[in-house]
Curated annotation (Swiss-Prot):
Together with its co-chaperonin GroES, plays an essential role in assisting protein folding. The GroEL-GroES system forms a nano-cage that allows encapsulation of the non-native substrate proteins and provides a physical environment optimized to promote and accelerate protein folding. GO terms for cellular component: cytoplasm. ATP binds at residues 30-33, 51, 87-91, 415, 495. InterPro entries: Chaperonin_Cpn60_CS, Cpn60/GroEL, Cpn60/GroEL/TCP-1, GroEL-like_apical_dom_sf, GROEL-like_equatorial_sf, TCP-1-like_intermed_sf. This is Chaperonin GroEL. GO terms for molecular function: ATP binding; ATP-dependent protein folding chaperone; isomerase activity; unfolded protein binding. GO terms for biological process: protein refolding. It is found in: Cytoplasm. It is an enzyme of class 5 (isomerase). The keyword Nucleotide-binding applies. The keyword RNA-binding does not apply.
Amino acid sequence: MAAKDVKFGNDARVKMLNGVNILADAVKVTLGPKGRNVVLDKSFGAPTITKDGVSVAREIELEDKFENMGAQMVKEVASKANDAAGDGTTTATVLAQAIVNEGLKAVAAGMNPMDLKRGIDKAVNSVVAELKNLSKPCETSKEIEQVGTISANSDSIVGQLIAQAMEKVGKEGVITVEDGTGLEDELDVVEGMQFDRGYLSPYFINKPETATVELDNPFILLVDKKISNIRELLPVLEGVAKAGKPLLIIAEDVEGEALATLVVNTMRGIVKVAAVKAPGFGDRRKAMLQDIAILTAGTVISEEIGMELEKATLEDLGQAKRIVINKDNTTIIDGIGDEAQIQGRVAQIRQQIEESTSDYDKEKLQERVAKLAGGVAVIKVGAATEVEMKEKKARVEDALHATRAAVEEGIVAGGGVALIRAAGRVVGLQGENEEQNVGIKLALRAMEAPLRQIVANAGEEASVIASAVKNGEGNFGYNAGTEQYGDMIAMGILDPTKVTRSALQFAASVAGLMITTECMVTELPKDDKADLGAAGMGGMGGMGGMM
């Protein structure tokens, strides 16, 4: 086991504080409408330019191991805020730095760290409760646009795109962010259910100009096994041909003789058919086939429940208004499924989301909800260079997370005002002893830190503006973008309540642990030169033996 370096008391805390300040100072330059960019060197390719706090935090690794421990703990604050609300990482870092700096001063003055922490926790819990009281629901498209604009660093085009996307696919819908091909940002909305499986043969194409298969008012056959024998399909094909409608087959696979016969029949115009593979794998495939069945009022032909493909009738087939298939995707538009059954299925999947512990599973279940409930919107980010594309894409993703958080828990006045107002409402809070009171006071004082940093980044005098905002009431605050005082909500400067709450809770949690630190242990650095020297000498000895 490697030897350890151990530091105690003030020595440990000073080192830890240095690390906290180095990381927080790098992150906090990005805060606010006039925040600056940070350039991150990469081991290959062009450097990354970002205004995203968590991206900056993740890059920082310090040489001094004790300082690095402090930096890593604040990095944890930014990461947790990002995971919980998708935004507010810089605010969380600024709050953590303010609480740690104030707290360690009190510890150095001889205060009991545990009582300080209890006081901080008490203040934070009270402020969180007040934030909930100050919060108002985020319902209109205009409010969603404003939240998106603020989170995308005052880029109103991004705010508009997110508001349009939410309007089209609903607040529960899936909105994804992808690299665009041009200079302009675009919004693509896929209505209906789309899954990532294309046609099994290009001979099914009936719209050569777009290389797609389009079926109007088709029947849909859902089978959860491979189909290779055409005899199994004949009864269904005959029934569909008599009805004079096209047919889409969704199965685990269609191969060999079955696929060849379908292609020949389609080319001769005997029956209009297309075949695609079922989406997903294993249990997820079965679940998605069932989703499609409910959406189209069909039945999955499954041998597990004793159904045979040869005995399938037209009653077992689903129906939709239209189906479009290209080489990569199949889109089912306007399935004829019963609305009550679809909503029941959505509720069932939502229950699974609540119970799931895996982020990947949650994401896939959320996609299934969106496909059943309305559709999928894709925001394609346009930029002139790859460096700009990366930076812009990160901002759009931040804005998307922030708007989701706003819809979930509501909005409060932005620009650091909500924290100051919430702190002002609990100014009379008392602890059980004087040291807890000091903890409460320093936590409430730290609530000003985000506003002060926004103002400092705008090149203004933080103390003057913080004092003016504190003396104001309601949503009165300072718009650093226009350098004007006024009603923050009327000016469109909003923060999601969830983002502000998460930032404060995670900052206080980690800061409280750092204030109560008394000892730090790390490995002593290895002396690589000495090791190499010893190895070299050994080699020389071997040579001597040979002679």
